[in-house]
From Swiss-Prot:
Keywords: Acetylation, Activator, Isopeptide bond, Nucleus, Transcription, Transcription regulation, Ubl conjugation
Protein source organism: Pongo abelii (Sumatran orangutan)
Protein name per its UniProtKB record: Mediator of RNA polymerase II transcription subunit 6
Subcellular location: Nucleus
Family as reported in the entry's similarity comment: Belongs to the Mediator complex subunit 6 family.
Superkingdom in the source lineage: Eukaryota
Role this protein plays: Component of the Mediator complex, a coactivator involved in the regulated transcription of nearly all RNA polymerase II-dependent genes. Mediator functions as a bridge to convey information from gene-specific regulatory proteins to the basal RNA polymerase II transcription machinery. Mediator is recruited to promoters by direct interactions with regulatory proteins and serves as a scaffold for the assembly of a functional preinitiation complex with RNA polymerase II and the general transcription factors.
UniProt crosslink position (Glycyl lysine isopeptide (Lys-Gly) (interchain with G-Cter in SUMO2)): K208
Subunit structure: Component of the Mediator complex, which is composed of MED1, MED4, MED6, MED7, MED8, MED9, MED10, MED11, MED12, MED13, MED13L, MED14, MED15, MED16, MED17, MED18, MED19, MED20, MED21, MED22, MED23, MED24, MED25, MED26, MED27, MED29, MED30, MED31, CCNC, CDK8 and CDC2L6/CDK11. The MED12, MED13, CCNC and CDK8 subunits form a distinct module termed the CDK8 module. Mediator containing the CDK8 module is less active than Mediator lacking this module in supporting transcriptional activation.
Residues with N6-acetyllysine modification: K236, K241
Pfam families reported in the protein's UniProt record: Med6
Length: 246
């Protein structure tokens, strides 16, 4: 597990002791800041040594190490305390600033933290804008790219849709469709046919057998009768033509 930077945690917390607020001033603000429950206070600082030896704060200038000083005071609301590294009586390195507003202590962010926060905020905004834009982008091979917004969908839903008129087919279209259906019927003949609506489909072979005419059987007596009639007609010969009267 990665180690957590304590300084980053201190930027997001605050500390307050309500019992000190009524008596808080320029002379007591450092004592208030040096409370044991204050997470911003470093107990290895020179202020703690001076406090234990009951010396004045002027002795801090003669010491080397971490110390806290009152940088600015605007009683009774605002106090600014600086944490610094003293290397000599005339040389110090600022480490952090703390501001007290109405008794509540906060750590002031350093320049790097401010820039980092601003950059992250800007990048997050740009990324959100790109994500939002990509959600409205559409693509189709035949149309290409276009924008599709939800407002257009709502307007299309509210707008009454015109009923599309069905155009009648032309004679050429009907003839062409009939020719295609006939061609398909010849290539793929049906195996079952429904003779009448509602009846059970019947195989095509069975319908062909029923459609074939049954040969009639002629009795021998009827054959002889027809022969005699034919002979009688042939014996008489053709009827004579009557002469026209002039």
């Amino acid at each position: 597990m990665a180690a957590v930077d304590i300084r980053d945690n201190l930027l997001g917390i605050s500390w307050v002791d309500s019992s000190w607020i009524p008596i808080l001033n320029s002379g007591s603000v450092l004592d208030y800041f040096s409370e044991r429950s204050n997470p911003f206070y470093d107990r290895t600082c020179n202020n703690e040594v001076v406090k234990m030896q009951r010396l004045t704060l002027e002795h801090l200038n003669q010491m080397v190490g971490i110390e806290y000083i009152l940088l600015h005071a605007q009683e009774p609301i605002l106090f600014i305390i600086r944490k610094q590294q003293r290397q000599s009586p005339a040389q110090v390195i600022p480490l952090a600033d703390y501001y007290i507003i109405a008794g509540v202590i906060y750590q002031a962010p350093d320049l790097g933290s401010v820039i980092n926060s601003r950059v992250l905020t800007a990048v997050h905004g740009i990324q959100s804008a790109f994500d939002e834009a990509m959600s409205y982008c559409r693509y189709h091979p035949s149309k290409g790219y276009w924008w599709h917004f939800k407002e257009h969908e709502e307007q299309d839903k509210v707008r009454p849709k015109a009923k599309r008129k069905e155009e009648p087919s032309s004679i050429f279209q009907r003839q062409r469709v009939d020719a295609l259906l006939l061609d398909l019927r010849q290539k793929f003949p049906p195996k079952f046919v429904q003779l009448k609506p509602g009846e059970k489909p019947v195989p095509v072979d069975q319908t062909k057998k029923e459609a074939e005419p049954v040969p009639e059987t002629v009795k021998p007596e009827e054959k002889e009768t027809t022969k005699n009639v034919q002979q009688t007609v042939s014996a008489k010969g053709p009827p004579e033509k009557r002469m026209r009267l002039q």
